[in-house]
């Protein structure tokens, strides 16, 4: 039985180094089970298989460098795991972590009045279909959709304004457009038509909840974060409704 120091380190997309460490007690066979053991001391407490990853902090204490991801990108992420016995490095392994595997397909959609981008994994069985509804910015970052698709989902990043054939502003957007998008997604060969979810944040979350209340039979789940229990107007001085249904 010996004490070892396990360190995890990486360089973020801005080139700044981050690191964590923890001391563990090995068993009679010299093995440490990070998922089953709490560290004796270190950058986190308790049993947590990912503790060394989330507890990393920047080695440079400059406050301008304390954000791990300054922007969402598909940047390849390499993490080094090192085992020290005393002050001696015994073994080191570098893991390459991909945000998105190469088997995720991307297809621009502009048909049946629907505008957006479809993401889906190659060569999979029919999957859960997810429509991601952006907020007031009007755009879903590709990396978010691709990341979800990499877990086996078919994702439609839906555009509903600021595009050809669509309203210029987030004002008087017909809810029927989203109903049409759900019905379109159900018919795609990659999708199990009985498994449709809406996902949105901010104004997109407001809209997802409104659509669930208006068209409950069109979907099976709603993921709404940074949502509101109120339905707000548009952002224009006229204070019109952001959404319409049956032309009202």
Which residue ranges define each predicted feature?
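Glycine-rich nucleophile elbow surrounding the catalytic serine of serine-hydrolase chemistry
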Residues: 200-210
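Short beta-strand element of the alpha/beta-hydrolase
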Residues: 126-135
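Alpha/beta-hydrolase active-site loop
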Residues: 169-189, 210
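Hydrolase active-site cap/lid region
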Residues: 209-248
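Ser/Thr-rich low-complexity repeats and stalk/linker segments
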Residues: 7-63
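Alpha/beta-hydrolase fold nucleophile elbow
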Residues: 190-202
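N-terminal cap/lid segment of alpha/beta-hydrolase-fold proteins
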Residues: 17-18, 26, 76-125
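Short amphipathic alpha-helix adjacent to the substrate-entry channel of hydrolases
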Residues: 141-158
């Amino acid at each position: 039985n010996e004490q070892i120091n396990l360190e995890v380190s990486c360089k973020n997309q801005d080139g700044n180094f981050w690191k964590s460490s923890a001391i563990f007690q090995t068993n009679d066979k010299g093995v440490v089970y990070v998922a089953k053991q709490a560290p004796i001391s270190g950058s986190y407490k308790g049993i947590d298989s990912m503790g060394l990853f989330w507890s990393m902090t920047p080695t440079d204490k400059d406050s301008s460098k304390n954000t791990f991801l300054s922007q969402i990108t598909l940047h390849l992420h390499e993490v080094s795991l090192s085992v020290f016995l005393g002050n001696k490095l015994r073994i080191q392994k570098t893991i390459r972590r991909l945000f998105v595997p190469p088997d995720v397909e991307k297809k621009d959609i502009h048909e049946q009045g629907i505008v957006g981008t479809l993401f889906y994994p190659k060569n999979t069985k029919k999957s859960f279909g997810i429509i991601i509804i952006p907020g007031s910015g009007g755009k879903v970052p590709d990396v978010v959709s691709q990341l979800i698709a990499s877990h086996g989902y078919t994702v439609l990043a839906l555009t509903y304004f600021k595009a050809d054939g669509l309203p210029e502003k987030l004002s008087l957007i017909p809810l029927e457009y989203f109903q049409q998008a759900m019905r379109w997604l159900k018919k795609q060969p990659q999708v199990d038509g009985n498994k449709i979810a809406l996902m949105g944040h901010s104004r997109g979350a407001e809209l997802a909840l409104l659509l669930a209340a208006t068209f409950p039979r069109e979907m099976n789940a709603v993921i709404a974060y940074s949502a509101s229990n109120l339905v707000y107007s548009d952002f224009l001085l006229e204070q019109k409704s952001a959404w319409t249904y049956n032309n009202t």
